[in-house]
Amino acid sequence: MFKITATEEHKLELIRWVDKHYHHYCLLDSNQYQDKYSTLNWELAFGTKRVLSSTYENAFEQLKKFCDYNSARVYGLLSYDLKNDTEKLSSANKSIINFPDIAFFEPEFIVTELDGYLVSEKFNLENNLSVVSDDQIHEHPQKYFKEVQTESEYIESIKTLKKHIYDGDIYEINYCISFIISEYKCNVVSIYNQLKKFSPNPFSCLLKFNNQYVISASPERFLKKLGKKIISQPIKGTIKRTDNIDRDKEELLNSEKERAENVMIVDLVRNDLKKCSETGTIQVEELFGIYTFPQLHQMISTIVSTAKKNLHVVDIIKSCFPMGSMTGAPKVR
């Protein structure tokens, strides 16, 4: 067993070292946030024993086999287009980043924060770390994000979506657009660290898969499984933080619009969980909970259930994928 004190400096030093020496790694960081279902504070998995990289066709079955091999612990991502493996759908929008639809790896090493230390069974933390000086990691190129969709195209899309709502075939929409920077050289670890300082959210992540990265700072728990218990905590309802936190929370809680959006997704999640849960076990544990984060207050509801016997965890994910707070409702028009 190897360990060093879990200072922020040691964590950042380790991430930089791993980024320099390995093609695959995944950092999971709660930023010290704890709730009743928290089980992990900080974890870095890296090195490559096996890799799964594929398009959406039969992706979930591939993932089941990948997980079951030696009962391996695996890390990775499921892209939005895996919806095409859950329903008879197709994708009209071409990806601008060309990430695999599913990308997972089994790591050689795992470092976890435990009782104030960074701990690893196999990786010698003290002997392998090396400091990267600040002048090597901070870059400030004069580049700006550009939207993929023009303003006029965006307005036309909104008109179309409004008509769908008016016609009644969609009743809640989460519309997303992309922004890009081309020919942008940067230090990804430095960008993640800046994001972490600005927005330290409980489900933050830095994933490297060959020469591609995902940087994430999310407050939302899609799914968690503890024993036979399934937990989903969709977010719908947001308000900016001001100096008067109590007034902020009351305004969000009493917003008819935000409550309507939230309860729609609660019903959608309950319906998704029916596919993978024992009959009669689905419960709304908390409705319209107000949670405070660095920049925002969020309305979060908690839905729990008991998983069906002998059901693979990947089947649970497939039953609920994509998450309702991302798709809107209904998922399929």
Language model features with spans:
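Extended alpha-helical targeting/anchoring segments
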Residues: 1-333
